[in-house]
Amino acid sequence: MRQMRFFAFFPAMTRRFFMAGLALIVAEASPVAAQDLMPTSAALTDPAKQVIVKSGNFMVRDHLVIDLRNGVEWMRCSVGQVWNGSNCEGEALQLTQENAAKAIIIANEQLGPGWRLPSRAELETLVCSECAPVKIELDSFPDTLAEPYWTGEINGFAPRHIWTVNFMTGHTYGRFFPTQEVLVRLVRNR
């Protein structure tokens, strides 16, 4: 009887994605420091710092924004910034898709499972066309930069490119290569 290799049961595309994911987990530590990505433990546990504000479809609770309509919760700050109880401190980091994946691993280890890059449709729900100069509700997402943010979605028309949503214009673009550095906002299902 011929021995079958483990990967023989999976299509080639699945093998590539699995190996890419495995490489990220085994890879050396991210150059992005974990403490620069996440809120401080005091900000997460101090009830006095937890604020609930209802704004349209969003409910804001400390470092999270809960999207009541779509059943997801967003990090209030961009990756690299830290929620201090009233705004986002620090510099939002522009990351490649590979480094964004490493930041997601850190977020899942420190804040619980499920954090990921948003889909194109999910990120587009944050666009506020009436808002200026940044096309997002700054009450819910303070200190957001008027720049593109990654989605986790490949452009089906140009498979070497990833979709982004630009919060300066409110438009979606599918022209960024995964090796380019773009801002990141994480989301997870509720």
What name fits each language-model region?
Residues 2, 6, 18, 30-116, ...:
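Glycine-aromatic-enriched surface loops/turns that form tight recognition elements
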Residues 12, 16-28:
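Bacterial N-terminal signal peptides
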